[in-house]
Amino acid sequence: ARDAMRVAGQIGFPVVLQVVSPDLPHKSDIGGVRLDLPSKSAVRNAYNSILKAVRARSSRISIAGSLVQQQLEGIEVILGATTDPQFGPVIVFGLGGIYVEALNDTVCRLIPITRQDAQSMVAEIKSAPLLNGFRGLARVDKRSIVTALSRLSTLVARFPDQLQELDINPMLVNAQGAVAVDAMALLTRSPSERKARDRRNRKSRHVGH
């Protein structure tokens, strides 16, 4: 908690605090994220509350630490990439944060994509009016989204055998640009790891017989 409080004081309030754990891809589902913390004491209380929530879920969850970020205003979007077994690498874009699964407002393209493809993806989601200043909301910098999509496509195309899945969720977008708030990457097993796993599987089947 002391380190989180110190970093928060250096960043400036308000801040966001979230748990860092390889076992928790969706931290907000268990109370692993606290927003709009106005002081060091609030950070300390949030830190203790997050730890309690994580331990209540399971004592086996690995906690690597905590992440302190400046509280920013904007619209949450998701950028992702995965490998379809039939079509290969696919890039995904849509409304992000907690609304991804609830609204299912996403579009996808096969990788690699052009900048024009990225522009089309941004325009095609049902929530596109939110990005254009809908009902008094500030118009966001859509060029920053297009750039992020293009760079993600380039990254996945460069390492198709190493990246199994990559999610940037949420990425916060406002009039000034875009900031990746949280991200998760799953790496493909190396050939040696796959062979070792296959040998273990064959051995366990043999022992079972």
Q: Over which residues does each language-model region extend?
A:
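ATP-dependent carboxylate/acyl-activation modules
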Residues: 1-209
